[in-house]
Amino acid sequence: MSRKVVQPPSLRIIPPLNFCPVEKQLYRSGQPSIINQSFLQDLNLKTIIWLASEEPQEEFLDYCSMNSINIEFVGMINDDYSYQNVNPWDSLNETTIKKALELICDRNNYPMLVCCGMGRHRTGTVIGCLRRLQGWNLASVSEEYRRFTGARGGRILVELLIEGFDISTVEIGSGKGSSMARKKR
């Protein structure tokens, strides 16, 4: 028996721009907006890692506050070394990448979303370094990074940063999610 849908559902479930699962209960995307809130609600997020150097939109901050989601402003680290050695147009450096990876490797922060403005380059850099930590080969890491950069293409300097990142500096505590560092591809 077929049923006819007379009216579309009033609640639309729309994922954020460039949304994709990375691992179980770990997701990546661009900055969520108000139309993504129903989708995010179903993820039961505990932590969001914000990688951009600029403040997120006010509605995004309000949503996180109302839902008791912890926001880690990794792209906005203000220590003296980072301040003097960071390109003001791109907030990622060894310090911020290391901090993001240590948060990702702590399973106490899950479910987790890693995001930046568009979910391309900054998010792709951190996820690329995570893949290196997991033992992925560089061809697979680069392919995944380029999948999210679209027609603009990847940035060779980002890929070189991912390749040159010293994964041995990332501190993974016992019981915090060390399984994240063992997956190979």
Curated annotation (Swiss-Prot):
Q: Where is the Tyrosine-protein phosphatase domain?
A: 18-178
Q: Give the species.
A: Meyerozyma guilliermondii (strain ATCC 6260 / CBS 566 / DSM 6381 / JCM 1539 / NBRC 10279 / NRRL Y-324)
Enzyme Commission number(s): 3.1.3.48
PANTHER family per the UniProt record, alphabetical: TYROSINE-PROTEIN PHOSPHATASE (PTHR31126), TYROSINE-PROTEIN PHOSPHATASE OCA1-RELATED (PTHR31126:SF8)
What catalytic activity is recorded? O-phospho-L-tyrosyl-[protein] + H2O = L-tyrosyl-[protein] + phosphate
* Family statement: Belongs to the protein-tyrosine phosphatase family.
Q: Which GO terms describe its cellular component?
A: cytoplasm
Provide an example Pfam family for this protein.
Answer: Y_phosphatase2
Listed SUPFAM superfamilies:
(Phosphotyrosine protein) phosphatases II (SSF52799)
Primary enzyme class: hydrolase
Disulfide bridge partners, by residue number: none
Q: Which domain of life is it from?
A: Eukaryota
* InterPro entries tied to this protein: PFA-DSPs, Prot-tyrosine_phosphatase-like, Siw14-like, TYR_PHOSPHATASE_DUAL_dom
Entry protein name: Putative tyrosine-protein phosphatase OCA1
**What GO biological process terms does the UniProt entry carry, in alphabetical order?**
cellular response to oxidative stress
What molecular function terms (GO) are annotated for this protein? protein tyrosine phosphatase activity
Known role? Putative tyrosine-protein phosphatase required for protection against superoxide stress.
Q: Does the keyword Cytoplasm apply?
A: yes
Subcellular localization is given as: Cytoplasm
